[in-house]
Swiss-Prot record:
UniProt GO MF annotations: ATP binding; phosphorelay response regulator activity; phosphorelay sensor kinase activity; protein kinase activator activity
Species in which this protein is naturally found: Prochlorococcus marinus (strain AS9601)
HAMAP family in the cross-refs: Kinase_SasA (MF_01837)
A GO BP entry: circadian rhythm
Protein name: Adaptive-response sensory kinase SasA
Length: 372
């Protein structure tokens, strides 16, 4: 005779989230004999059952909902299994006291407290946990929205420059149409990213493949030509002809180059120079360096500039400080398994370095670089 207490749960998760270690361990445990409950687990995908999000007021997934026994509880985040493990013994104890017919009355030692107060304490604890999870999720979504919004500026700026160039007779109408078409495709991809904000991690939106960093940097330099030519800034490149291809998301790598080269132009003096270097330091990494001879960054600020929501004060020339762009660069590079840093001296200039994994065939190890 099975005397296990029944436990009804609903797991709300996107398809790609089901492959995370936390969710795999959760499902395996609930299906195993080690679980002290007779568990009924319903797995639902939010795209197929969006009404669950509203019904249970979910703003974060994956989420595990305890439907019965009452009261309802919700666990969300990247550590659902560990959260559940903390509560299982308590639920088991609650079930035991009920099955034995024990009437939980206030004790003589603490006669001023009622059973309702204890239940309220439990509910308050659950609410605090949910609030903490929701706060983290909201912060994550805000960060992602800022990044996507920042990326959206790139194709819009490129399209605007193309229109201006066509008006000045620098490009013909067919070239303008080609540029506009390509930028609209980029905007379409970004809009898809925005739709995925609530259901997946930003890292999961990456599409790593075999790409040529030399070509990407050349495209970005050409795209920003109007900005560096008008200020008579010289851009030199040192890219070996035998530089290997890398394993990265082409659109995201382009964003890194655009942000860093745009910053280098922005902080360079008129008639200044920028140097872009790429070297194959090891069998696994390509290191890219972008140097300018601008105002430089104080040592105390060199780590902070890569953080979210950090903007340095204006320089003496009145140029606005680094904004969200460097935070975007950091996250993109880290998702690829690389690192980014700056070497700078006030009054001399700055060199931004970052590494990207070499293409060695699309094996599992490299695919895992993009899984946060």
């Amino acid at each position: 005779m099975n005397d296990k207490k029944e436990l009804k749960l609903i797991l709300v998760a996107a398809r790609n989230q089901l492959s995370s270690n936390d969710i795999k361990c959760l499902i395996a445990y609930l299906e195993s004999d080690d679980c002290e409950f007779e568990t009924s687990l319903q797995i639902s995908e939010p795209k197929e059952q969006p009404e669950l999000l509203e019904l249970h007021r979910l703003v974060a997934i994956p989420a595990l909902i305890k439907v019965s026994p009452a009261p309802k509880q919700i666990f969300a985040g990247s550590n659902i299994f560990s959260q559940l493990q903390k509560w299982l013994p308590r639920w088991s104890q609650e079930g035991l006291t009920k099955n034995l017919g024990i009437n939980l009355q206030p004790s003589k030692i603490d006669s001023t407290r009622t059973q309702k107060e204890f239940l309220l304490e439990d509910e308050l604890l659950v609410l605090r946990q949910e609030n903490e999870t929701l706060t983290k999720r909201i912060e994550s979504q805000e960060r992602l929205l800022r990044m996507v919004a920042h990326e959206l500026r790139t194709p819009l700026t490129a399209a605007t420059l193309a229109v201006q160039s066509q008006k000045l007779g620098q490009i013909d109408i067919s070239k303008l149409q080609e540029v506009i078409k390509r930028r609209l495709e980029e905007i379409e991809l970004l809009s898809q990213d925005l739709l995925e904000v609530g259901t997946t991690k930003w890292e999961a939106l990456f599409n790593p493949q075999k790409i040529d960093l030399g070509n990407i940097s050349a495209e970005v330099i050409l795209e920003l030509e109007k900005f560096w030519r008008i200020r008579n800034i010289e851009i030199d490149t040192d890219i070996p002809s035998d530089l290997p291809s890398v394993f990265a998301d082409q659109r995201r790598m382009r964003q890194v180059f655009l942000n860093l080269i745009e910053n280098a132009i922005k902080f360079s003096k008129d008639s200044g120079s920028i140097k872009i270097t790429m070297i194959h330091k090891t069998n696994q990494w390509v290191e890219i360096t972008i140097c300018d001879k601008g105002a430089g960054i104080p040592l105390s600020e060199q780590k902070r500039i890569f953080l979210d929501r950090v903007r340095l004060p204006q320089t003496s020339e009145g140029t606005s400080g680094f904004g969200i762009g460097l935070s975007v660069c950091r996250r993109i590079v880290q998702v690829h398994g690389g690192r980014i840093w700056v070497v700078s001296e006030v009054g001399v200039g700055s060199c931004f370095h970052f590494t990207v994994p070499v293409w060695q065939g699309q094996n599992k190890e490299q695919q895992n670089l993009t899984k946060g």
